[in-house]
Amino acid sequence: MRFGEIVLSLLGGILLVGFGGGGLKDLPAASGKQADAVTGREIYSNTCIRCHGIDGKGVMGLQLVPKPADLTSPGIQGRLDASLFKRIHDGKPNTAMGAWSASLSDDEIWDVLAYVRTFRQE
């Protein structure tokens, strides 16, 4: 390895550690229990369905600007669990997607995420 490549590698590592890998390292872990898609479905039906619809495609909230995310899309399904957890927990600024951290426990958010993962298109 050349000296320049070593320096760049070290700088990249320092930046990654210094910025916390995009802020995802501080996410709460599930409490040790397996996330439950069945429980997640019940929570989804009471909280998320209004905008994201029964099938997760977002058709219930088409009147919203911007439209709700299509939870079946490869763009959503391809995201890391930690990223989706953070979105549910913290919401998305300037959209109708509010933070659910005041209403749902971390375990409940993980359960919802387990259910959302059932929307994956084959």
Question: What do the PLM-derived regions correspond to, one by one?
Answer:
Residues G20-I43, M60:
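Electrostatic cytochrome c docking/interface patches
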Residues G12, G22, N46, D90, ...:
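Residues within well-ordered alpha-helical secondary structure of globular protein domains
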Residues I49, G53-P68, T72:
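N-terminal, post-signal-peptide region of Sec/Tat-exported proteins
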Residues S9-G18:
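Bacterial N-terminal signal peptides
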Residues I43, F119-E122:
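Short sequence/structural segments immediately N-terminal
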Residues V65-F119:
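Extracytoplasmic electron-transfer domains, predominantly the class I c-type cytochrome c fold
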Residues Q34-K57, S83-H89:
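Sequence/structural segment immediately N-terminal to covalent heme-attachment motifs in c-type
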Residues M1-L10:
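Bacterial N-terminal signal peptides that target proteins for export
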